[in-house]
Curated annotation (Swiss-Prot):
Belongs to the NifD/NifK/NifE/NifN family. InterPro entries: Nase/OxRdtase_comp1 (IPR000510), Nase_comp1_asu (IPR010143), Nase_comp1_CS (IPR000318), Nase_Mo-Fe_asu (IPR005972). It is an enzyme of class 1 (oxidoreductase). It comes from the Bacteria. Binds 1 [8Fe-7S] cluster per heterodimer. Binds 1 [7Fe-Mo-9S-C-homocitryl] cluster per subunit. Its cofactor is [8Fe-7S] cluster; [7Fe-Mo-9S-C-homocitryl] cluster. The lineage of its organism: Bacteria, Pseudomonadati, Pseudomonadota, Alphaproteobacteria, Hyphomicrobiales. Tetramer of two alpha and two beta chains. Forms complex with the iron protein (nitrogenase component 2). The gene is nifD. This is Nitrogenase molybdenum-iron protein alpha chain. [7Fe-Mo-9S-C-homocitryl] cluster binds at C283, H451. One of its GO terms (molecular function) is metal ion binding. This molybdenum-iron protein is part of the nitrogenase complex that catalyzes the key enzymatic reactions in nitrogen fixation. The keyword ATP-binding applies. Keywords: ATP-binding, Iron, Iron-sulfur, Metal-binding, Molybdenum, Nitrogen fixation, Nucleotide-binding, Oxidoreductase.
Length: 500
């Protein structure tokens, strides 16, 4: 049952504020003061969520964030399928991040596509003392020999590379010239940079600008035959096929997708992007930088879209169509009408089973708000949400378009805080990452992994909404929960038995 149906908004707000104070009591005074700035209760009418964000995590806490290398290699560059991405530094960073994201792609692995392969080398202490450029040259030569159909290479720097000052830019230029002008992109994404993976996104965007788009501009040759309806999908990483289910809708409404990146993206699509008429941006946090650059440099407008759940899909299709003529606007309405029977069937089947169920979210820099509409389409209520690496403009978007009055907001929440919030608010479902998954399942509550869809998906588009609804129902209403109870539900049952 929805909390709002049994408590007034004022009561919910007061309860959540009291909960925040209770959680902060365990900290030393200075730490409590710092963490208090990241925890708040949303108040309707405010322009943002009232929390500080994009600030260094407190040393010693179990933060859930990643590093700049993760943001660049793991998020932005890694899914570009026809380029080889080198983890430049000690073996651990590449090994322990290998295959952690489900970036689907079309191609033959090891021949013309390399997403699920890991390229690194035996970087040792002597390389830190004497420099790693010689080994970098060697691995570049080996890649050229072993994988001759690669269309480009990126060098993703790990922490030691920035500390010892290896000149990866000079190596990149020299080897590019040696290989006949092959695209080789040095990326200064050392993990110590910034406060989270967010700076890695920005660094990766800047590398696209400096080493891809600037070269395309200098070349001056057209990459595609232009049409009035050319668009690019940016910031969809094709987790479980998300970008494909989004692309279907755009093409059905009459648009031509000339570039899709990073998920299932290629170097040729990156180069063609500068000739599009509109950039359609999914993950604002990781790709707004390059979208803004293309608007300033090439005059290409951009707009955000959200294809989670039918309400937001329809809203986004109409927003995108607004940049084009009546043909595309009519196409958008036609697509919405076409899929309405599917939407009706999904809601008729799953909403009665999920109505009033409560959810708490904690994801990266986008989904903590984007998926809220899909839950609401199923009659569910998000009672708490926050970002690992969101910025203030993310919380502004969250406050203005997604969360309700009284929602608990938690930025850069650590393991202790998140567990206490869940214990007290007792949601029917928690949606977060792989590090949190088993903690909450062991606590006896349903959980969905909202970074990679728990090996399901896609969740984007109308087809994805059906899968999303099925997965949420499967998590919450699984028969296994009849065999075990969350501690707070056991306590409630004991109280009822005592009262009888």
């Amino acid at each position: 049952m929805s909390l709002a149906s049994t408590q007034s908004i004022a009561e919910i707000r007061a309860r959540n504020k009291e909960l925040i104070q209770e959680v902060l009591k365990v900290y030393p005074e200075k730490t409590a003061k710092r963490r208090a700035k990241h925890l708040n209760v949303h108040q309707a009418g405010k322009s943002d969520c009232g929390v500080k964000s994009n600030i260094k995590s407190i040393p010693g806490v179990m933060t859930i964030r990643g590093c700049a290398y993760a943001g660049s290699k793991g998020v932005v560059w890694g899914p570009i399928k026809d380029m080889v991405h080198i983890s430049h530094g000690p073996v651990g960073c590449g090994q322990y991040s290998w295959g952690s994201r489900r970036n689907y792609y079309v191609g033959t692995t090891g021949i013309d596509s390399f997403v699920t392969l890991q390229f690194t080398f035996d970087f040792r202490e002597k390389d830190i003392v004497f420099g790693g450029d010689k080994k970098l040259v060697k691995i570049l030569d080996e890649i050229q020999e072993l994988f001759p159909l690669n269309n480009g290479i990126t060098i993703q720097s790990e922490c030691p590379i920035g500390l010892i000052g290896d000149d990866i830019e000079a190596v990149s230029r020299a080897k590019s010239k040696e290989y006949g002008g092959k695209t080789i992109v040095p990326v200064r994404c050392e993990g110590f940079r910034g406060v989270s993976q967010s700076l890695g996104h920005h660094i990766a965007n800047d590398a696209v600008r400096d080493w891809i788009f600037d070269q395309v501009e200098a070349d001056g040759k057209p990459k595609v035959e232009p049409t009035p309806y050319d668009v690019a999908i940016i910031g969809d990483y094709n987790i479980g096929g998300d970008a494909w289910s989004s692309r279907i809708l755009l093409e059905e409404m009459g648009l031509r997708v000339i570039a899709q990146w990073s998920g299932d993206g290629s170097l040729a699509e990156l180069e063609a992007n500068v000739e599009g008429k509109l950039n359609i941006l999914h993950c604002y946090r990781s790709m707004n930088y390059i979208s803004r650059h293309m608007e300033e440099k090439f005059g290409i407008p951009w707009c955000e879209y959200n294809f989670f759940g039918p309400s937001k899909i329809a809203e986004s299709l109409r927003r995108i169509a607004g940049y084009f003529d009546d043909k595309i606007k009519e196409g958008a309405e036609r697509v919405i009408e076409k899929y309405q029977p599917l939407v009706n069937a999904v809601i008729a089947k799953y909403r009665p089973r999920l109505e009033g169920k409560t959810v708490m979210l904690y994801v990266g820099g986008l989904r903590s708000r984007h998926v809220i509409g899909a839950y609401e389409d199923l009659g569910m209520e998000v009672i708490g949400t926050g970002y690992e690496f969101g910025h203030n403009d993310d919380y502004q978007r969250t406050a203005q378009h997604y969360v309700k009055d009284g929602t608990l907001i938690h930025d850069d929440v650590n393991g202790y805080e998140f567990e206490r919030f869940v214990e007290k608010l007792q949601p029917d479902l928690v949606g977060s990452g792989i590090k949190e998954k088993y903690v909450f399942q062991k606590m006896g509550g349903p959980f969905r992994q909202m970074h990679s869809w728990d090996y399901s998906g896609p969740y984007h588009g109308y087809d994805g909404f059906a899968i999303f609804a099925r997965d949420m129902d499967m998590a919450i209403n699984s028969p296994v929960w009849k065999k075990t109870k969350a501690p707070w539900k056991e306590a409630s049952r004991a109280k009822l038995l005592a009262a009888e």
